[in-house]
Amino acid sequence: MQFPFSGAGPGVFTSSPALSLALADAVAGRNSGGGGKMVTAAHGGVGGGGGGGRAKARDALEVENEMSRSGSDHLDVVSCGDAGGGGGDDDDDEDAEHGNPPKRKKRYHRHTPQQIQELEAMFKECPHPDEKQRAELSKRLGLEPRQVKFWFQNRRTQMKMQLERHENSLLKQENDKLRSENLSIREATSNAVCVGCGGPAMLGEVSLEEHHLRVENARLKDELSRVCALAAKFLGKSISVMAPPQMHQPHPVPGSSLELAVGGIGSMPSATMPISTITDFAGAMSSSMGTVITPMKSEAEPSAMAGIDKSLFLELAMSAMDELVKMAQMGDPLWIPGASVPSSPAKESLNFEEYLNTFPPCIGVKPEGYVSEASRESGIVIIDDGAALVETLMDERRWSDMFSCMIAKASTTEEISTGVAGSRNGALLLVSDEHSVMQAELQVLSPLVPIREVKFLRFSKQLADGVWAVVDVSADELMRDQGITSASSTANMNCRRLPSGCVLQDTPNGFVKVTWVEHTEYDEASVHPLYRPLLRSGLALGAGRWIATLQRQCECLALLMSSIALPENDSSAIHPEGKRSMLKLARRMTDNFCAGVSTSSTREWSKLVGLTGNIGEDVHVMARKSVDEPGTPPGVVLSAATSVWMPVMPERLFNFLHNKGLRAEWDILSNGGPMQEVTSIAKGQQNGNTVCLLKASPTKDKQNSMLILQETCADASGSMVVYAPVDIPAMHLVMSGGDSSCVALLPSGFAILPAGPSIGADHKMGGSLLTVAFQILANSQPSAKLTVESVETVSNLISCTIKKIKTALHCDV
């Protein structure tokens, strides 16, 4: 697997300090932002002798003067004797008749905005076009080739002059600073007096305080030089230690990941670097390290990273980035094809022996009792460019929204580095919860698998033009070494995240190729034996699941915003605002369902002890009190969930559960008849990704004041069917564009995963792992006490539903 940055040589990162493409974009941005001032001179070949030489000198001087003026527009200075000028005028003809050489008279031609835009775009692509490119450009713009040639010459000259002026300004600032420091030292030395006698002090007694200040200043300079050297290593260009710091603001956070394409794709910050930020990455590093950005904390709250050597985190992040890129590119023998490992369902498996020989352990040796899980997957994602996806991955809210079925909770406490010039190149985050515990909670939708609680750094870097990488690596050991401690839930699974992440490469057809690598070590002692093969194979939280979820979500966003015809499975004819409100309600329903299945801290569920009665140990029952909670009925809410193995393929099981005509075979809400579809909103080209509103068959008294809101999601890694009964008046309000947050619902549903290659002690092959979960209102009074009867009711509902499903699929063995 090869990437454009692999073996590209000096063409990838331009080594010329005067005209690198990055700086070219910066100056271009400044020029265009200020009005885009430039003059292009096209000299003719008619004039001769000494007059012609003087005319050329005058032309060059005028061009330079025009370039230095900030208020001029894009003009063409064309000699009347030029071939493009159409010849001379009457005065020139008279001079020629008297034998005198014609006078050079300049005619100014103003470029149109379209011509300027085309020239600027071509300059960003190729600052040195060849003759063929200039001819093609001149023909397209209606200009002479010579005009195009001189426009590019003047553009390069202008950029070089501005860069030189900027560098001279920095050198002057540094020189003034050194002069001032030297003067203050001389004054302190000459005016020093002895405290005891009042006379002149000896040099050794001058100022012990100043001596300490000098030592501290030297130490800080040495530390800054070390950090700048580290930054230069991954930026690929030299870093100025004396560059003035710049204050970078935190990146804005949109309201929802459903606004990804609007706020993240369509309005991405410009990748060009303005001239004010050419002070190198040292300024950004100084700012971000001196002023800690804590978006989840108030300004008065002390930072958990205060006084910590953050360069160590940067070293760890760069080491992890190097390992991720190599693992994404390398093949055999590091990655063994799946055909060579018959017991593995993955396309390829990591050769752990080769891995240990190739990469030094960046986070220490594997703890005793931990098992390893590694996977790699590639796929094409429907998104405009990789930079937009990087923005989503580097924003913890949008990241957790994008992978809501896999991420129970995540947030960012510290933003060590915000990146360069507003982009995410070089951004380094500590991903954590709001209590300064750097962590994220990864979930498998089953009560038999504890939450994976991981503490890690997230680091993004632009490897080449159109190529990005985002890497995660656990920071537990480093945090402990720095004296940062955090309490983790004992009910969660201990987990370490080795260098994992994705490499994003823009494709010519406007999509993004994503190569995802997942490498984790965890303690599987708390995992039920039914799910251990699934986790080890990477089917639960491996690279394939991340890729499949990303593809499904991006397809959904692209479809909802596109103006193309709706898929056949979309029957919605409601107002766009009503569609948005209905999708928002379905999203909340699915999130509540996931929170009820897992043991995440996002919801205050309490596991019941002593009230389980005859319930089996594989059925997990939890309860919580709802008091004045929008979107949830008041009272005591019970949640029960369990997971079972089903000897049917996941596709067949999913098709059965979301089939409206077969609903009566397992759902007591169907009133014994098929469901009728009121409306449906497609979330993908496949029939399995929809949000629909169902209506149950009427009862004997022909009264039915209830609808069923249902969301189904399906991809190559698994599927879900989530539903909840809703009131008809409330749904009328939602479908007319009203606020959906006031609609009370309690979700129930199913999560389906493909079973691992070997399940349990009897080695059952294939099949599906089905998770069933129900939430019911046990009592409408929040202060009421639970009874064993309420717990047994929800448990019996689960058992009865599973039995009906097995009977309908003829797999009740």
Swiss-Prot record:
The keyword Nucleus applies. Pfam families: Homeodomain, START. Residues 104-163 bind DNA. Residues 306-559 form the START domain. GO terms for molecular function: DNA binding; DNA-binding transcription factor activity, RNA polymerase II-specific; lipid binding. GO terms for cellular component: nucleus. Residues 62-112 are annotated as: Disordered. Belongs to the HD-ZIP homeobox family. Class IV subfamily. This is Homeobox-leucine zipper protein ROC4. InterPro entries: GLABRA2/ANL2/PDF2/ATML1-like, HD, Homeobox_CS, Homeodomain-like_sf, HTH_motif, START_lipid-bd_dom. The gene is ROC4. It is found in: Nucleus. Residues 152-191 form a coiled coil. Residues 101-112 have a biased composition (Basic residues).
